[in-house]
């Protein structure tokens, strides 16, 4: 447990710029477990804090996201909004994202679990989490934002020192 706390501190504070003692977590066995755990935690957050029903909660992620995201949707009985990406840069189509969010609201979706990738497994694409959050905030929607950094998390923060994909961004919660 002491080693785990030390590793968490290095990752959270030194790599991802969290405030000291502002984080919690554990070392997962892999990215699949970490993603499922994050989505499970957020589903329970919405259920416990907003009395949300599972059918009111939806996961949003790109079509290039890790297979663990649709798996989590299946395990936790949540819908998944799969957002298409551009062919060349593999970045989400923001206009489709907005249309899908608007359509989800008409289908009684009130709570959004966003998974933004810090390096997709197949292409290494780094998504801008603000693309998701700007639209959700435009419509004043409740959301939680998870960064899937299983693939790029040990490279991207060091290769892009100016990145804002870290815990200095108050919108990112895991």
PLM regions with names:
Residues 1-31, 45, 49:
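Conserved N-terminal alpha-helix of the aminotransferase class I/II PLP-enzyme fold
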Residues 30, 34-174:
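Conserved PLP-enzyme active-site core in the AAT-like
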